[in-house]
Amino acid sequence: MTAIIDVQQAFEGEEVISIDIPSPAELELWANAVLKYEGLSDQEVTIRFTDEAESQSLNSEYRGKHKPTNVLSFPFEAPPGIEINLLGDLVICAPVISREAEEQDKQVSDHYAHMTVHGLLHLMGYDHIDDAEAEEMEGKEIDILAQLGIDNPYDADE
């Protein structure tokens, strides 16, 4: 199984936040861990890194929430009869990830890994709307991150 990652960086103005953005190799490592865990074959995903303005605009348009968020997922739905290994798109807000990592006393790279895994699971149909769904999804995140040598991101929440 291989993840094919199309990375986009979309920043306006003079923001210098790309320094924290994971490398394509890191993104592929994290995505491949998710694919392996879920038993999926080759999949393609676009990961777009944005500023807060774009994140807030998309979050408002698609979720009715008028603030930037860490990650948004847009699953690809192929027309009936069309087979394509395209999971969809992730939109990751770099300033939110950096801020959350600092607030939660986490390594920025670990938080990027967590939000990438989280977003990919959303693309695969997992959600956390109710407690049972959240428990299942968080369990998968914890397992996948552990395989990557990353501590349980929810430990601070418990």
Swiss-Prot record:
One of its GO terms (biological process) is rRNA processing. Its cofactor is Zn(2+). GO terms for molecular function: metalloendopeptidase activity; RNA endonuclease activity; zinc ion binding. Its EC number is 3.1.-.-. Gene3D superfamilies: Metalloproteases ('zincins'), catalytic domain. Binds 1 zinc ion. It is found in: Cytoplasm. The keyword Glycoprotein does not apply. It is an enzyme of class 3 (hydrolase). Zn(2+) binds at residues 118, 122, 128. Single strand-specific metallo-endoribonuclease involved in late-stage 70S ribosome quality control and in maturation of the 3' terminus of the 16S rRNA. Belongs to the endoribonuclease YbeY family. This is Endoribonuclease YbeY. It comes from Alteromonas mediterranea (strain DSM 17117 / CIP 110805 / LMG 28347 / Deep ecotype). The gene is ybeY.
